[in-house]
């Protein structure tokens, strides 16, 4: 089974509505697979990282509220040998360093159509 990280942008620019939409998507994903949730703003609070077990339902939660640095979850994923990472974000931060795992992005329509940086990685827009 692939080791997947879901990095959730907790920065102040991510609205509560967007955070709720992200958790809605994750509740759907949890019907299919287990994954590791990696919350971040400018850093990853490692005591807040947890495994979301297959079949669990969770409510949206915000555990921090600073700026945004995509290098924080990228470094965490690289250090912990994940196979893939999906970053849930509003895309409002500079482009991160390279990731050893396959990386993709999930954002809203605005973030997908007007991202802060260009990437060849897959970007999925949710409503």
Predicted region positions:
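Acidic, low-complexity intrinsically disordered regions
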Residues: 1-127
């Amino acid at each position: 089974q692939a080791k997947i990280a879901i990095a959730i942008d907790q920065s102040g620019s991510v609205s509560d509505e967007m955070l709720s939409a992200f958790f809605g998507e994750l509740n759907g994903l949890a019907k299919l697979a287990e994954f590791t949730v990696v919350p971040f703003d400018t850093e990853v609070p490692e005591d807040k990282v947890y495994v979301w077990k297959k079949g669990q339902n969770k409510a949206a939660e915000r555990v921090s509220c600073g700026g945004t640095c995509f290098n924080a979850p990228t470094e965490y994923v690289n250090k912990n040998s994940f196979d893939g990472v999906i970053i849930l974000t509003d895309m409002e931060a500079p482009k991160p360093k390279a990731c050893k795992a396959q990386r993709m992005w999930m954002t809203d329509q605005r973030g997908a159509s007007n991202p802060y940086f260009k990437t060849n990685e897959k970007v999925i827009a949710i409503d």
